[in-house]
Structure formats: C-alpha cells, structure tokens
Amino acid sequence: MKPLWKGPIKDGITQSLLGKFLACRERFRLKIYGLASENDFDAKLQYGNMWHHCEELYSGGAAWSFIHESLLEYARSIAAEYPQCSPDIHRWYRVCACQFPVYIEHWQKHPEQIEKQPFAQEYTFRVPYELPKGRKVLLRGKFDAVDIIDGSYWLQENKTKSVIDHHQLSKQLLCDMQVMFYLVALRQLMQQGIEPWGQVDRIGGVRYNVIRRPLSGGKGTIVQHKPTKNNPAGESEDEFYARLQGIIRDDPSSFFARWRVAIVSADIDKFELEFLIPILEQLCDWWRYIAHGTQKYKYLHYRTPYGLWPMTTAYDELLDYGNTGGLTNIANLFPEL
C-alpha cells in the first residue's frame, strides 16, 4: 500500500496536517496512507464550515438569496455524509441561515468596511519555504482574506466561537499555529515576489473576525416554546428561528466582533525559530525514514500514549486490536484546498 502523500517537499504541508504530525506520528502515518475515521462528526466544526461556505460566496459578491440556497445544498451534502447526525445538521443550518443575513447587515453599515482595501479572498497558496539544511518544503493553505490597510497587508481570520474573548485570542496569537503559519507563508509570498504579492512590502498584523455561535450558552441561548394552555400549538420551528434572529439583530455586538492585532517582523522570526523550522526539519527527516527506510531517523517515529492523546479513536482500534471498523479510505489529503 502506497501513501497518498509524496512528502513535504513534493506535496507540501498544511497547518492542519502539521498539527496531526505534531499530535502523533503513528496516527499521522495512518492518515497519509489514506485512512480516516468514518464517525468524526463535530457540530462546532461543521457550523464553522457552514459559515465559511457563506463567507466565501459573500466575498465573491453573491447575494443572500443565492447564498441561502447554496447553504441549504451544502447542509444536505453534510447530511448525506453523516446521515445519523441529520437533526443536528438541520439545526445548525437553520441557525446559520438566521444569523448570516444579520451579519451582512451589521458590517455593511460599519465604518471598518470603508477603510480597508480588499486584496485577496479565499486565496489558495503553495509557496516554497527553504529550511536551514537547504531543503525546500511547500507551505500550503488558504487565506480567508487579506486586505490592505494603511499600506500594510492584514490577514483576516474568521472564527466561530461559543464566546467572544478578545483578550484570549489576542494573547495566544504569537504562538497560534494556524495564524502564524499563514503569516510565514504571506511573508514568503511577499519576499519571493510571487504575483500579485509584491505590491506591498510589510505585514500589519491580523484582523480577527469573530462570530459567536448562538445556542451555545449566554445571550441568545433560547429553547423552543412548548404547547401551553394559552398556546396549544406551541412555537413552530420558523417562529423559533425568527425569534432567535430578532435577538441577534437587537444586539449584534454580542454576536459579531472585529479587531486588529499588530504584528512585527520579529514576531514571525520568533515563531519560525522556536517552532516552525525545528518541526519541519523533523518532518523531512521522519519522512525519509517512513518513505525510504533511512534507519538513523527511525527514533523520530512514535505513537503518542493515551493521556497526551485525548481519546480512543478508530485509529486506536486498528493499532490495538487490528480492527478496521470505523475507518474509511480517502483519496485526498487536502480537501480544504
């Protein structure tokens, strides 16, 4: 059985795959050989994916009527993949469908929209990154958006969260793997003069665009009214989501927030030296052992034990008992691209 992946130099690495390598080398090996869990549905993640789907269409100029129709088709595709989770998927589709139009209304009238110059939306990058040993790894990913503000590039990060915590997100930024990985890639695009990125010569920082998920605790966490003596029919599904939309519309600042965090070149340098370069050098050496059997690198391969590995997964059923139930074969390691 051959791996789907041709290694970090030929096929490149995304921050998502790098995170899997960091978490457990053996489970990562199973992943690159095309094995994935069948039952890995995550409602929070899927809501974020629904929101991202809407953002991508909206940034391309689509009207809400088209976005809404496309969102429904997208939700149906998720339900086809996870039929046992259809009620959850329908619920979060309805939440997204009532929240996103209020989001559009809110930011259309906000001055923040006027001062930025949109530069790139949903930009897929594949940029060579030279390591100290001379090897060139391909950094891969997709920017949500990059804008020009006051003559600098600002990376936009869209986040769906149960709570909007300005302090926590800003505090962890300098060692946030996804954001800093993207900033490294952005700087490489600029420095290498890859079109169209040579127009601006500095990075201003990160612009957070945070959306609070309703029905996740706090304001907006409501329940559908049950039938009563005075209202035998109770509250219909449409009435419930209309009420939720009204709560969001009456207090949009509790559900939508944007702010900037400035970054200087030394912050990116620090992330590269303390994390990215060491882990990518290890990844390249580890791959030489996995793909070519280079024995001097065999001790870079290990299985992370329980306790550090958060849960028992379908991978562990295979590793512990040889049971392949719950695993499926995949053909693409980069579905997000």
Per-range role (PLM):
Residues M1-L337:
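RecB-family 4Fe-4S metal-dependent nuclease core
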